[in-house]
Design a protein with these regions (language model features):
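Detector for methionine-enriched segments
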Residues: 1, 10, 33, 83, ...
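Generic intrinsically disordered, low-complexity segments enriched for polar/acidic and small residues
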Residues: 2, 40-41, 127, 149
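Charge-dense, extended regions
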Residues: 122-177
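Short, charged recognition helix plus adjacent turn
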Residues: 17-38
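Short linear sequence motifs
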Residues: 14, 36-37, 145, 162
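Basic, Lys/Arg-rich alpha-helical nucleic-acid-recognition elements, primarily the DNA-binding modules
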Residues: 1-23
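Mid-protein regulatory/catalytic core that forms ligand/cofactor-binding pockets
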Residues: 44-140
Length: 177
């Protein structure tokens, strides 16, 4: 299976983030996906099996986990992209840190495209507006690289207010103790 960089028509690079993740015991996309599930991406818990030792958010913050899952050097994986998108929208993420990491890791085009999808679902959420404003538009991502936009959202059919589709970005639940 080709890497995400290859599917995007980009060359790979020596990644400081990937070196940090590996040094923290997270050596592949599968271990990052396990960590994402442990950190609250329970929506995807049936996607991966097993656990990984969580190095802690002081060593691997959720912003780094998000960009790590979206990293172009891993083998292309729709599940990793979906979990990376969920972690991108985590409630306590620092938008400026996400921006810096996206630039450093050559993920600007991908993060901008996810922000565009996020904004279409949650136009009032400040993260999506910030990323869209700050990241350059380098054109569309080739078809078939990203999962369909509906794979990044949860939709309801019937709510307390009655019938109607309500969409929201899938993001990690807050994990307590």
């Amino acid at each position: 299976m080709p890497s995400l960089f290859r599917r995007l028509g980009m060359t790979s690079h020596c990644s400081p983030l990937r070196r940090r993740l590996t040094a923290s015991g997270l050596e592949d996309a599968e271990s990052l996906m396990r960590l994402a599930v442990q950190r609250g991406c329970r929506y995807y818990r049936d996607t991966v099996t097993g656990t990984v030792v969580d190095p802690g958010t002081d060593r691997v913050p959720n912003e780094e986990l998000a960009i790590g899952l979206l990293h172009g050097s891993w083998e292309w994986s729709p599940a990793a992209l979906r979990m990376g998108a969920a972690m991108l929208g985590a409630r306590d993420n620092d938008p400026s840190k996400l921006l810096r990491l996206a630039r450093m890791e050559r993920a600007e085009t991908l993060v901008r495209e996810l922000a565009k999808i996020g904004w279409s679902i949650e136009p009032a959420h400040p993260l999506w507006s910030y990323l869209l404003h700050e990241l350059p538009d380098r054109g569309p991502i080739p078809g078939g690289v990203l999962p369909h936009p509906t794979r990044f959202m949860a939709m309801t059919g019937i709510t307390r207010e009655g019938r109607g589709i309500r969409s929201q970005w899938i993001r990690p639940e807050v994990v307590r103790g």
